């Protein structure tokens, strides 16, 4: 297998976020996550792949108006940074959202860290 290009990794990163949030299809991203991935978020404990797959539908159930809009994506080597705007996550208003993802040589995410901050009030 050839090493994924930055364009491919950017596509994987944006697909993960839009599929999880806008399409609300948690299981549809499993093939892009490494079996031993570590997922971190500024307001949640670290999670494994199986913990994310079990937990994420709960977030969606509590966030019927949750949406993400990708604003910018930067790839360098095996790392991708995604800047987006989200709204409706767990009743929050509009937030800046940054995800930093590290990919392996097969194009699977091995580590993801997300940080959000509210920029407009609660919904």
From Swiss-Prot:
The pathway entry for this protein reads as: Mycotoxin biosynthesis
Question: Could you mention a single GO BP entry for this protein?
Answer: ochratoxin A biosynthetic process
InterPro entries hit by this protein: NTF2-like_dom_sf (IPR032710), SnoaL-like (IPR037401)
EC number(s) recorded for this UniProt protein: 5.-.-.-
Q: What's a Pfam family in this record? A: SnoaL_2
Question: Which cysteines does the record link by disulfide bonds?
Answer: none
What is the enzyme's class at the highest EC level? isomerase
The keyword Aminoacyl-tRNA synthetase is annotated on this UniProt entry: no
Report if keyword Kinase is assigned: no
Per its record, what are the GO molecular function terms?
Answer: isomerase activity
Keywords in alphabetical order: Isomerase
Q: Which family does it belong to?
A: Belongs to the aurE cyclase family.
Name of the protein this chain belongs to: Probable cyclase otaY
